[in-house]
Amino acid sequence: MAVKIRLKRMGTKKKPFYRIVVADSRSPRDGRFIETIGTYDPVAEPAQVKIDEELALKWLQNGAKPSDTVRSLLSKQGILEKFHNLKYGK
């Protein structure tokens, strides 16, 4: 089972709100997911991002691949740098 960390769209028309979820790569964007690890609100000024760091690191260590957008959000939060340091022992 290929696992991805990606965005699940919520909210109303023209006012999107996203949950950052861990899901099987074969399931639809807003379909079945394994676990919710955070939220992303691009409409707020500035955009609000809340990610459970422990859960994100756990899933990254288990081999989950983040989507491009989630990768940039994780990077801005400093989580990818921590994952890199854990993986390569720095």
From Swiss-Prot:
GO CC terms: cytoplasm; small ribosomal subunit
Keywords: Ribonucleoprotein, Ribosomal protein
Family stated for the protein in its record: Belongs to the bacterial ribosomal protein bS16 family.
NCBIfam families referenced in this protein's UniProt entry, alphabetically: S16 (TIGR00002)
Domain of life, source organism: Bacteria
HAMAP family per UniProt: Ribosomal_bS16 (MF_00385)
Keyword Ribonucleoprotein belongs to the record: yes
Keyword Chloroplast annotated: no
Protein name: Small ribosomal subunit protein bS16
One annotated GO molecular function: structural constituent of ribosome
One Pfam family here: Ribosomal_S16
Biological process, per Gene Ontology: translation
Database matches in Gene3D superfamilies: 3.30.1320.10
